[in-house]
């Protein structure tokens, strides 16, 4: 869902592009395996050098977009080697994450693969600037755009009204 606003914008502004959507987890794949907004939907292979190379040989991407916490080190390294424009959107960084640890050099190198990093907040931008990155733009969280879009299209459901009566109802999901 977090990448959906971007997919829809790309589809609208560049209808000639072929869009490949990948998932690593079965839960994400199962929810979106029939999504009509893209041309292809596949599982992403385990991130090994060989798998990254084979995947990119098959896909031939011109642009790669990662979302939030998606840092596939071998895939990123191969994208960079092939000079594929690569972006991350809705990324968020915290001071205690591996990128900012003394032993996080390999992970910091992965960040060099991104042409632009679109982060959620100023803190993330400052942390990355502290590592020497100036290709960072604060753009917020695409998830909020998607929630607003879903809320605007919400349908009235009689059974919910009957269930809650005149009381307020609070629903929480994916609350980890």
Predicted regions and their residues:
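A short helix/loop element that forms part of the nucleotide-sugar donor recognition site in Leloir-type
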Residues: 149-164
């Amino acid at each position: 869902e977090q990448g959906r606003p971007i997919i829809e914008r790309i589809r609208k502004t560049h209808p000639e592009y072929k869009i490949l959507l990948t998932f690593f987890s079965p839960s994400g794949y199962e929810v979106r395996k029939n999504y009509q907004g893209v041309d292809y939907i596949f599982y992403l292979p385990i991130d090994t050098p060989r798998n990254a190379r084979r995947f990119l040989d098959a896909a031939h991407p011109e642009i790669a977009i990662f979302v939030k916490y998606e840092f596939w080190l071998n895939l990123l390294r191969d994208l960079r080697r092939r000079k594929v424009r690569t972006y991350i959107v809705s990324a968020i960084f915290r001071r205690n994450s591996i990128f900012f640890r003394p032993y996080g050099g390999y992970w910091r190198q992965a960040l060099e693969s991104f042409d632009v990093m679109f982060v959620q907040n100023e803190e993330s931008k400052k942390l990355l600037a502290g590592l020497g990155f100036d290709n960072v733009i604060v753009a917020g969280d695409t998830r909020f755009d998607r929630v607003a879009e879903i809320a605007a299209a919400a349908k009235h459901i009689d059974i919910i009204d009957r269930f809650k009566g005149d009381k307020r109802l609070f629903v929480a999901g994916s609350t980890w």
